[in-house]
Every structure is written in C-alpha cells, then in structure tokens.
Amino acid sequence: MRTISKALILLAAAFLSSAVDSEACTNVLVTKGASTDGSNMVSYAADSHQLYGELYYAPAGVWIAGDMRQINEWDTGKFLGYIPQPARTYQRVGNMNEHQLIIAETTYGGRPELEGNNGIMDYGSLIYVALERAKTAREAIKVIVDLANTYGYYSSGESFSIADTEEVWVMDLIGKGKDEKGIVWVARRVPDGYICAHANQARISTFPLNDPEN
C-alpha cells in the first residue's frame, strides 16, 4: 500500500511540474456591442497555481531627463537593462491602467530561430511599460512596436489582447532572430459586437494590407 501511495504522489508531482512549465494561457475578448452593459472586456487566465497570485501595482510618475526604468524579465526576474523614462507615466494595477487600458497575452512560441535573445524587452515588460505609457489601445500598439524595435525583443511569439473603453485589438508578434533587432507584427481590431479568444496559438491568420485603421 505504501508503495502504491508513493507512486501516486510521484506521479502527481510530475504532473504538477509539467503543468507549471506548459504554456496554458487563455484570453477571452468581448467588445462592448457583445456585452450586456456595453463594456469592453478581456479575461486573462493560466492553468497554474503559481501564476497571478498577486496584482502588480505601479503609481503614476513624473520624471526628468536622465531618469531610467529598470527592465527585468517577467518570468524569471532576470535583469535585462535600463530604458529612459518618459516625462510622465500612468498608474497601473494588474493588467489595467488608470485610463482603463487593458493588455493581456498568451504565448504561441513560433519558430525557435526567431526567438529574440539580443534585446532587453521581454513580453511581460512590453505589457507593463505600455500600460505605463499609453492611454488607448492604438497608442499601446505603437508603444510596444517602438520599444521592441528600439531596445530589441527578448521573448518568443506572443499574442496580445489590447482593449480600451472604445476598441478591442489582437496583436501577434515575434522576433526577427539573433541577427536582427525588433519584431515582426500584425494587429487587427475586433469588430464591435463580436467575441474573440486565443489560447497559445497565433490568432491572426489573414489580414488586409490596405486597411491600417482596422
């Protein structure tokens, strides 16, 4: 009986260990036209008992020339570098800031040779720095692209869910590999009245080349 119990405990421990390491995030995006109260919504869940046990808080700030922000990899806490602070940053709690801008993500990985390793902006830092610097979803997309292309990308392929009080967007991005800095990316607006979801798969499969507004 003891042998069986030990085997079951070891099996459970192995299962839990593999579950923590696996990519198991889910985002559900609801536009205001599809919600009963007229609100845009984004949910962010991960199948892990170790994730999202706390809400990250950063107060609003006013900065002067020369002030720097430290960048640590979100998953590991590894120090990656510093970037200059803008003149002002916004308060954020969890994955929302004071302007009701929301950014969440799921990791799809992508081709391993495109994984970014020559920059300092990992996917978590892109999320939280964008929340500190942007008021709207469109501004957040621009901030993310500018940060990744300026300071380099340090993660694998990601799908970001980005929403404000008016619009909901999905953004897929991936690095350019070890020899190039920056990201390849595409973003699409979720039409009002629709619901969208993604779970560790690149979400955007087709997109128009002549419709930058959507």
Model-derived regions, located:
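A contiguous strand-loop segment
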Residues: 25-123, 143-214
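Intrinsically disordered or highly flexible coil/loop and linker segments, enriched in small
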Residues: 2, 17, 153-157
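Bacterial N-terminal signal peptides
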Residues: 7-18
